[in-house]
């Protein structure tokens, strides 16, 4: 008799995705981040649900409700810090996952890659709106500065900003709608992640060598379920260590001050995972130009498949492109550092140089190095 695991309509879907899924036998730990991102999403939804039970999305009580969660709710401090630091872990996994996709040529699976880019944008939007909810100084001013960027859109800009605000400034209406969207978006992300997985399983995973793995596949379970548990252990160890020992390591001290529209903080900056994009935004003196550069810093991922000039899928055997890739990683770290610095000399010049390098490497230097490598292969 055939196992119900293979015949039951619901069990069959799970079985084909996580148990009997044919998986390349040589994929490394870099392929672990998909399951880690799924874990992060589950952690975020669970902790977020418990936080929403005690949080009040009102300008008069939001800040004190977060203080109440931290002080009075049983393990409220832990739920809150798991949620806040869980977001950091989520973005670390996201960046590593995207980096793996770039390095090993996973962007050639167009549908999977484009859904992944949409997932990244949706996650960034969710994190931004979540940062506004505690209603501290950085919450308020971050929301004001970032939403105000839309006023750079010609003709409809200022109307659009007021429509998003629900008034003439960031206020009660803004906080309420941000809470609404912050609550609903993770479920949309979960749905998009399912579609992401669906498209991935149409083609199957790539592998480090970049050549077809059709002749050599193994079932996902027990091989990769066991392997993924190791990565999961490290993720949970890092998250719990951060939460229990240094919960405020990645947060801004300004956010422990109640939002005050009459007092601007000296340095308005977002959470660390947005600093690279924020640095690109600030490096352009023109407002509209900055907004376009900010959007392109993420949307450029969608044009990467079109700039793929190499005869090989993976970068594993392409030393010139590898140099370009690691230069891009160093450039992103530089941008992250610059995003947290004040707008003054020499940070302005470093930020502008790093921003130019970011787009130059992705759009020009990586395709160029691929063409050189193609030429060298003929020799």
Swiss-Prot record:
It comes from Callithrix jacchus (White-tufted-ear marmoset). Keywords: Electron transport, Heme, Iron, Membrane, Metal-binding, Mitochondrion, Mitochondrion inner membrane, Respiratory chain, Transmembrane, Transmembrane helix, Transport, Ubiquinone. The chain crosses the membrane at residues 33-53, 77-98, 113-133, 178-198, 226-246, 288-308, 320-340, 347-367. Belongs to the cytochrome b family. It holds the Pfam family Cytochrom_B_C. Its main location: mitochondrion. Heme b b566 binds at residues 97, 196. One of its GO terms (cellular component) is mitochondrial inner membrane. SUPFAM superfamilies: a domain/subunit of cytochrome bc1 complex (Ubiquinol-cytochrome c reductase), Transmembrane di-heme cytochromes. This is Cytochrome b. Heme b b562 binds at residues 83, 182. Binds 2 heme b groups non-covalently. GO terms for molecular function: metal ion binding; ubiquinol-cytochrome-c reductase activity. A ubiquinone binds at residue 201. It comes from the Eukaryota. Component of the ubiquinol-cytochrome c reductase complex (complex III or cytochrome b-c1 complex) that is part of the mitochondrial respiratory chain. The b-c1 complex mediates electron transfer from ubiquinol to cytochrome c. Contributes to the generation of a proton gradient across the mitochondrial membrane that is then used for ATP synthesis. PANTHER family: CYTOCHROME B (PTHR19271:SF16). InterPro entries: Cyt_b/b6_C, Cyt_b/b6_C_sf, Cyt_b/b6_N, Cytb/b6-like_sf, Cytochrome_b, Cytochrome_b_C_euk/bac, Cytochrome_b_N_euk/bac, Di-haem_cyt_TM. One of its GO terms (biological process) is mitochondrial electron transport, ubiquinol to cytochrome c. The cytochrome bc1 complex contains 11 subunits: 3 respiratory subunits (MT-CYB, CYC1 and UQCRFS1), 2 core proteins (UQCRC1 and UQCRC2) and 6 low-molecular weight proteins (UQCRH/QCR6, UQCRB/QCR7, UQCRQ/QCR8, UQCR10/QCR9, UQCR11/QCR10 and a cleavage product of UQCRFS1). This cytochrome bc1 complex then forms a dimer. Heme 1 (or BL or b562) is low-potential and absorbs at about 562 nm, and heme 2 (or BH or b566) is high-potential and absorbs at about 566 nm. It is found in: Mitochondrion inner membrane. Its cofactor is heme b. It is a multi-pass membrane protein.
């Amino acid at each position: 008799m055939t196992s119900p695991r293979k015949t039951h309509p619901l069990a069959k879907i799970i079985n084909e995705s996580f148990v009997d899924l044919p998986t390349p036998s040589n994929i490394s730990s870099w392929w672990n981040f998909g399951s880690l991102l799924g874990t992060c999403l589950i952690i975020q939804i669970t902790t977020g649900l418990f936080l929403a039970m005690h949080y009040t999305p009102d300008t008069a009580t939001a800040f004190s409700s977060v203080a109440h969660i931290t002080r009075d709710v049983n393990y409220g401090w832990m739920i809150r810090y798991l949620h806040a630091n869980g977001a950091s872990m989520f973005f670390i996994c996201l960046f590593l996952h995207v980096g793996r996709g770039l390095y090993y040529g996973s962007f050639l699976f167009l549908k999977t890659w484009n859904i992944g880019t949409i997932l990244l944008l949706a996650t960034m939007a969710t994190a931004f709106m979540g940062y506004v909810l505690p209603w501290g100084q950085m919450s308020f001013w971050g929301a004001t500065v970032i939403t105000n960027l839309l006023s750079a859109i010609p003709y409809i800009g200022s109307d659009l900003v007021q429509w998003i605000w629900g008034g003439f400034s960031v206020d009660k209406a803004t906080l309420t709608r941000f809470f609404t969207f912050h609550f609903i978006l993770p479920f949309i992300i979960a749905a998009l992640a399912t579609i992401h997985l669906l498209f991935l399983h149409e083609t199957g995973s790539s592998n480090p060598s970049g050549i077809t793995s059709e002749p050599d596949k193994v079932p996902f379970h027990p091989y990769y379920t066991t392997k993924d548990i190791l990565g999961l252990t490290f993720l949970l160890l890092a998250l719990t260590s951060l939460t229990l020992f240094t919960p405020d390591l990645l947060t801004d001290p300004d956010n422990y001050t109640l939002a005050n529209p009459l007092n601007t903080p000296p340095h308005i900056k977002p959470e660390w995972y947005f600093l690279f994009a924020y640095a690109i935004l600030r490096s352009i003196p023109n407002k509209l130009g900055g907004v376009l550069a900010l959007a392109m810093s993420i949307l450029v991922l969608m044009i990467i498949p079109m700039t793929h000039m190499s005869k090989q899928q993976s970068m594993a055997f392409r030393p010139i492109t590898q140099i370009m890739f690691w230069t891009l990683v160093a450039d992103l770290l530089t941008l992250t550092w610059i995003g947290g610095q004040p707008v003054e000399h020499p940070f302005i010049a470093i930020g502008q140089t790093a921003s130019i390098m970011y787009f130059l490497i992705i759009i020009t230097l990586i395709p160029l190095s691929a063409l050189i490598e193609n030429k060298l292969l003929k020799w």
